[in-house]
A protein has these predicted regions:
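Hydrophobic alpha-helical transmembrane segments of membrane transport/permease proteins
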Residues: 13-64, 79, 154-173
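Alpha-helical transmembrane segments of multipass membrane proteins
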Residues: 13, 17, 21, 142, ...
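Cytoplasmic-entry segments and transmembrane alpha-helices of multi-pass inner-membrane transporters
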Residues: 1-9, 113-149, 250
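Membrane-interfacial helix-loop-helix junctions in multi-pass membrane proteins
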Residues: 50-58, 75-82, 186, 262-270
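An internal, D/E-rich "acidic patch" concept
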Residues: 55-112
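Alpha-helical transmembrane segments of integral membrane proteins
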Residues: 1, 89, 93-126, 165-304
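Transmembrane helix irregularities
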Residues: 28, 137-140, 241
Length: 304
């Protein structure tokens, strides 16, 4: 029942998000035809407004937009006029999902072991070194890490391509740029979860029963210590997708982040609203999946 209620709640929530995005994007100064290569005459501008129904009242435009959404149509792009929003999403979303997925796996693969090691070696060199490394990557934004990686690994050493997206080698530097920050966040969450779990009574009981330290750490402590990371996974995936805006622009990757930035700057109303709705759906679905995974890992949790 809990999951059915969550799914049923999606519809009114998406209506609210669509209305807010549709209204707010039109409050921004400027219009979708202000940055034409050649300044449009008043007659041409009026014709363009009429063609895309932008001369109608906002409430009427919104109802027309909802009618298209019901049919799976996000409308035409006002900047990329030979393409619809649906076409552009179909083109860019797989690229952004691939980049975000690889960065997610990288962040988990680095952050969880690093947090585990620092917690188990609390007060030792491993703890201090790992904690410093996690804090360091958190403090350096992708806008700084990206150019550094390009200059060192691409321009100086020629190990990886500078930009674009076409082979596995093209994905290495963008994945590192996007995933390093989140690996530090996960490491800190894992360390805190592990330290809290190691002080629990059931861990003391397990040790008193004569279980080996390896069994205590991996069979009993790890399963509960990783729960904060699981809870963070939903927002993490959403952050990776939105954080890819910067990375995609640095490395000129043809994902939806590039389209989102360009559409926002050019007041491409339909594109902006369509991408906002897309990210909202992804966030809602990911949070629901995280709740389900959390209940599987911790049997004490029951959603009703």
């Amino acid at each position: 029942m809990y999951y059915l209620r969550r799914i049923a709640f999606f519809v009114p929530l998406m209506l609210l998000i669509s209305f807010m995005a549709f209204s707010l994007v039109r409050l921004a100064p400027g219009g979708p035809f202000d940055k034409e290569r050649k300044p449009a005459s008043p007659e041409v501008e009026r014709a363009l407004l009429a063609k895309y129904h932008l001369d109608e009242p906002v409430w009427k435009q919104y109802l027309r937009y909802l009618g298209g959404l019901v049919q799976g149509d996000f409308g035409p792009s006002l900047k990329y006029r030979n393409h619809s929003v649906t076409d552009i999403i179909a083109q860019g979303l797989p690229v952004s999902l691939s980049l975000g997925g690889m960065a997610f796996l990288f962040a988990l693969g680095i952050g969880i072991p690093l947090g585990f090691i620092t917690a188990v070696n609390k007060g030792n060199f491993g703890d201090y070194a790992g904690s410093f490394l996690a804090l360091l990557v958190i403090c350096i934004p992708a806008l700084v890490i990206g150019p550094i990686l390009i200059m060192f690994f691409a321009i100086k050493l020629h190990w990886f391509p500078v930009a674009l997206w076409g082979s596995p080698w093209h994905a290495v530097l963008p994945t590192l740029t996007l995933g390093l920050y989140f690996s530090g966040r996960i490491a800190r969450l894992m360390r805190e979860g592990m330290m809290t779990t190691l002080h629990s009574e059931f861990i003391t009981t397990a040790r008193a029963k004569g279980l080996s330290e390896t069994a205590v750490l991996f069979k009993h402590a790890f399963r509960l210590a990783v729960l904060p990371v699981v809870s963070y996974s939903g927002p993490l995936l959403a952050d990776l997708l939105t954080g890819s805006f910067v990375v995609e622009n640095i490395f000129q990757i043809p994902g939806i982040g590039v389209f989102m930035v360009n559409s926002s700057l050019n007041r491409d109303y339909t594109m902006v609203v369509g991408l906002v709705l897309l990210y909202a759906v992804l966030l809602l679905v990911l949070n629901l999946a995280v709740d389900f995974a959390y209940s599987l890992l911790d049997r004490r949790v029951r959603y009703e």
